[in-house]
Amino acid sequence: MHNMSDIIEQYIKKLFEESNEDVVEIQRANIAQRFDCVPSQLNYVIKTRFTNEHGYEIESKRGGGGYIRITKIENKDATGYINHLLQIIGPSISQQQAYYILDGLLDKGLISEREARMIQVIVDRETLKMDVVARDIIRANILKRLLPIINFY
């Protein structure tokens, strides 16, 4: 059985499919009511599943007529998506951000489940046992070296 976050994520992805557009606009209160959950649950899903690393941009307007606009960053090919990821990595990256990137690569069919798991082990904090700053820098360097290879094959 899926948890509420998975259900909300699938619903939003279905909205993209049905609209055939790269932009979906939702209202926090309506979604919360539809799924009988608190608005913070929706915020969690947006913050963790529709990130820049996953290939989305978020615009949010709070208040009475507030909305959340989710825009797919459209990269028609693998090269465009990988170049986008290389731009957002920066000099360092957290483990969670790295996992988001791997999720995005997996969603787009650029890596297999097995490859994603192997890369997760490589960039995991248990593998990179050192101070946080150095670990995040090394993790970024690993991903910057891997991404062009993923694009090549």
From Swiss-Prot:
> Which keywords does UniProt give here?
DNA-binding, Repressor, Stress response, Transcription, Transcription regulation
**GO BP field:** regulation of DNA-templated transcription
Record carries keyword Metal-binding: no
Cross-referenced Gene3D superfamilies, in alphabetical order?
Transcriptional regulator CtsR, C-terminal domain, Transcriptional regulator CtsR, winged HTH domain
An example molecular function term from Gene Ontology annotations: DNA binding
Family assignment? Answer: Belongs to the CtsR family.
| Name of this protein | Transcriptional regulator CtsR
Organism (species): Staphylococcus haemolyticus (strain JCSC1435)
Q: Which gene encodes it?
A: ctsR
